C-alpha cells in the first residue's frame, strides 16, 4: 500500500470503475463486499494517511441460493476431513461435478514449531484418493479452457487467473501476518494488507459457492476477524 501507484504517474482523461459483477453470485459478492468494507476501515484505522480505497466492491446481478459457509475446526486433520466432506456434499447433494470444484490454500508447505514440514498437498491428496475423488493440480499452464480431470488443488498464486463454480479455501493459518496494530512499522502493515489481498484474490475466483475452513478465530487472527465479524 506504500508502493508507487501507476495512476499517479500516468496522465489520463477519465477514470472508469467496472462495478457490475456478471460472474459471481449475490451471496458471494455480498460476503466479499462486507470483507472489503471491514478491511478498508481497518486499514484506515491502522494508517489514516492511506489516500485510496484498497479493496473495491462490486454489484452482483444473479443469485445462486447458496450461502457462504465458514467451518471452524480444531486442527489440520479436521481441516482435511472437512474439505473431503465438503467436496462429497457438493458432488452428491448439490449436483456439482468434480471439475467444478477447487481447493485453495496459501502455500505448498507449512513449518511447525519443531521445524518439521507438513506437506498439506500430500495429506490432502491421500485423503482424496481414499475417498475415490479425482483431482488435479493447478500450475501456470492451466487456464479456464484447460480440460479438468477432477477437483483442482491450487495455491493462491496459481488460482488467480482461474474461476470455479465452487471453491473451498483452507489453511489460511499458513499466512504469516495474522495480527497487526497501529504501533507496527509500515512494512508490517504492508505485509498484513498483502495477506488480506491473498484472501480477497482467492474469494474472487468462485462463482456460486464459497466455503472457508479454518482453525483460527477472530481472537487469534485479525484476518479471520475481518472475514467473519
What are these regions (language model features)?
Residues 77-84, 88-211, 216-229:
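Core RecA-like ATPase module of SF1/SF2 helicases and allied nucleic-acid translocases
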Residues 9-11, 60-64, 94-96:
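Short, flexible turn/loop "capping" segments at secondary-structure junctions
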Residues 2, 32, 120-124:
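Generic structural signal for hydrophobic residues
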Residues 24, 28, 72-84:
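Phosphate/oxyanion-binding active-site loops and adjacent basic polyanion-contact surfaces
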Residues 56, 60-79:
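Glycine-rich phosphate-binding "P-loop"
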Residues 3-56:
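Conserved coupling/interface region of RecA-like P-loop/ASCE motor cores
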Residues 18-23, 74, 214-218:
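Acidic carboxylate-rich catalytic motifs and surrounding loops in phosphoryl-/glycosyl-chemistry enzymes
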Residues 13-17, 67-70, 153:
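Conserved beta-strand scaffold positions in the cores of enzyme catalytic domains, especially
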Amino acid at each position: 500500500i506504500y508502493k508507487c501507484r501507476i495512476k499517479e504517474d500516468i496522465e489520463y482523461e477519465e477514470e472508469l470503475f467496472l462495478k457490475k459483477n456478471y460472474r459471481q453470485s449475490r451471496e458471494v459478492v455480498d460476503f466479499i463486499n462486507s470483507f472489503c468494507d471491514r478491511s478498508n476501515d481497518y486499514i484506515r484505522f491502522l494508517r489514516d494517511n492511506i489516500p485510496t480505497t484498497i479493496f473495491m466492491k462490486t454489484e452482483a446481478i444473479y443469485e445462486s441460493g447458496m450461502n457462504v459457509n465458514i467451518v471452524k475446526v480444531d486442527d489440520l486433520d479436521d481441516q482435511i476431513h472437512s474439505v473431503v466432506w465438503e467436496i462429497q456434499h457438493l458432488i452428491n447433494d448439490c449436483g456439482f461435478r468434480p471439475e467444478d470444484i477447487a481447493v485453495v490454500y496459501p502455500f505448498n508447505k507449512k513449518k511447525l514449531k519443531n521445524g518439521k514440514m507438513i506437506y498439506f498437498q500430500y495429506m490432502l491428496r491421500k485423503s482424496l484418493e481414499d475417498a475415490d475423488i479425482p483431482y488435479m493440480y493447478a500450475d501456470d499452464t492451466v487456464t479456464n479452457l484447460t480440460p479438468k480431470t477432477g477437483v483442482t488443488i491450487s495455491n493462491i498464486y496459481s488460482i488467480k487467473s482461474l474461476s470455479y463454480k465452487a471453491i473451498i479455501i483452507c489453511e489460511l493459518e499458513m499466512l504469516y501476518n495474522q495480527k497487526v496494530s497501529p504501533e507496527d512499522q509500515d512494512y508490517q502493515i504492508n505485509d498484513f494488507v498483502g495477506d488480506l489481498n491473498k484472501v480477497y484474490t482467492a474469494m474472487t475466483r468462485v462463482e456460486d459457492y464459497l466455503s472457508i475452513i479454518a482453525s483460527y478465530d477472530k481472537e487469534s487472527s485479525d484476518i479471520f476477524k475481518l472475514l467473519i465479524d
